[in-house]
Amino acid sequence: MPALDEIKSSWADEVELDSGSLPPPTEIIENGQKIVTEYKYNKDDKKVKVVRTYKITRLVVPKSIAMRKNWSKFGDSSNDKPGPNPQTTMVSEDVYMQFVSNKEEEQKSDNALDSLKNIAKCRICEGEHWSLSCPYKGTAYEAGKAKPVVPVQQEMAPTTAKSGKYVPPSMRDSQKPGMGGNPRGRDDTTAIRISNLSEAMTEADLEELVKKIGPHSKMFLARDKNTGLCKGFAYVHFKSRRDAATAIELLNGHGYDHLILNVEWSKPQNPQ
């Protein structure tokens, strides 16, 4: 009986068997270049060949960088060769760090201070500083720079009466010929005092109240220093005593802003 011939597989079966494996990548180094050939499947599930060409350059680097390149890799890259793997690592341009000192900033601040020196000028020694911080302040140098002051005639010494009583300064001028007893030199004989005014009283309201009676020379509305409200009284100086008497006659007992006004002659502050 003749021997059975060995059954050989067809070419289609061989292609089917080889379709699941890819050739291993190859590297060729020549003329300062490294040529890497790889095989992979594209989107259409077709086998393609990828060829990458790298230019080999040699750089002098510190020992620490060279040691880091020889570190053992781990994970999916445990079998990779030393250096970056082009499939997983993209090498970009080197970034060099430059450490700048603060000398430039200090120089800029010094220039700014130098420009401010010309602003301040001392009036005592004409130096480049304020007069308040002048080292010659209160010394003989400042006294020599001061302008001469015209001497003022000294006033007469305060006199005392024969009875030995103290005479206030406001009453001393009344003893001199031609001098009145009013310290402020005003005529209070035409002044009236209006009291019982409301807190909301203003100078405009006071002007409206007395302007129809007669011309006046001055008005004073007393106000509180803290609140600024009216204290309840005011003074009006008329130009004639007749107008002042008419104002007392008309306004005394007159109702204004729900209050009854009290108007009388202004009493002198220092009666003789």
From Swiss-Prot:
Disordered: annotated segments: 1-28, 157-188
An example molecular function term from Gene Ontology annotations: translation initiation factor activity
Compartments reported by the entry: Cytoplasm
Domain of life: Eukaryota
Family matches, as Pfam families: eIF3g, RRM_1
Any GO CC annotation of this UniProt entry: eukaryotic 48S preinitiation complex
Keywords: Cytoplasm, Initiation factor, Protein biosynthesis, RNA-binding
Chain's role: RNA-binding component of the eukaryotic translation initiation factor 3 (eIF-3) complex, which is involved in protein synthesis of a specialized repertoire of mRNAs and, together with other initiation factors, stimulates binding of mRNA and methionyl-tRNAi to the 40S ribosome. The eIF-3 complex specifically targets and initiates translation of a subset of mRNAs involved in cell proliferation. This subunit can bind 18S rRNA.
PANTHER family named in the record: EUKARYOTIC TRANSLATION INITIATION FACTOR 3 SUBUNIT G (PTHR10352)
Subunit structure: Component of the eukaryotic translation initiation factor 3 (eIF-3) complex.
Family, per entry: Belongs to the eIF-3 subunit G family.
Protein name as annotated: Eukaryotic translation initiation factor 3 subunit G
